Amino acid sequence: MEAVKAEAWEGAAVAQDLLALGYGGVPGAASRGASCPDFRGLCVRLAAELATLGALEQQREAGAEVLSAGDGPGAEEDFLRQLGSLLRELHCPDRALCGGDGAAALREPGAGLRLLRFLCSELQATRLLCLRSLLDPSPRPPLGEGVVEGAGMVQELDLTLQALGLPRPAPGTPASQLLQELHAKISELQPSLPPGSLQPLLSCSLDAPRWEALESLSQSLRDQYRCRRCLLLKRLDLTTSAFHWSDRAEAQGEAMRAVLIPIREVLTPESDISIAHVLAARADLSCLVPATSVAVRRGTCCAINKVLMGNVPDRGGRPNELEPPMPTWRSRREDGGPQCWGRKKKKKK
């Protein structure tokens, strides 16, 4: 009973996707799989639009069909052979559909609907990407920025492989194969983790209002972070500039700038934390640990904590050390000021 309900729900979802894409509803013989000409024709139309929009990597001759429906005796075999190649090219995650015996897989209950659902999702994503490229007025990034971004992705991938203990893949390894190896390794290590260690921090489903609220909160935090970081960077600039006031710094000024400028250029006020980090965060991130606890200090203490500052010159400026102000200077008056005209006493001899 539950399987029938699930298949009915899947059929309704596929019908809704097809209507949104501008195609007709699900053919009545979708359960018959590749043996149904209407089912093959619908798959052919979906694959043809994918090829037109440039979603396929393999180059084909002009006028060549990605899938052929056909009506002859060998039409079903040709369709299944071409379908297997198409699904592998699109990196379909459904192993049953990409296997060798495609005819038997499509005869299983719900297999035809799964195939249509996958093709519809690929077509929806391709249309969105094409629409984004048409509506985005911003210019394409230059080659240098793309190379830097690609280098960052490669660095993240290297760190992931090192953390999992996997060797670096050989040049030319397909991304799908690498992701499968990562998935297999993570699935192997997951049972050894404590229970609940992979629980997401954000467990509720996000609808449109929640997405807007999350984006607004993220923007507010980024603005506040930028304001605070600008203040810290300004204090850093003032502190480093104070080192150039001494007599010794005049001779070592170029060497000091050669060390400080590359480090300072990396420090930007913008934050690199995005909503993707929030979605990838785990529940243990919300645990508040005292910064002075023994476990935390074991990981944060370093040798510089034991270094004592030497004697530094006293800059003064204390209120109790301030001297009274100097009286203002006044010129002499013309009358010579007050005079005393009394009788003077004679000095004794």
From Swiss-Prot:
Disulfide-bonded cysteines: none
Region Disordered, residue ranges: 313-349
Residues spanning the signal sequence: none
Pfam family for this entry, one: DUF2465
GO cellular component: tRNA-splicing ligase complex
Recorded family membership: Belongs to the FAM98 family.
Name assigned to this protein: Protein FAM98C
Source organism (scientific name): Homo sapiens (Human)
High-level lineage: Eukaryota, Metazoa, Chordata, Craniata, Vertebrata
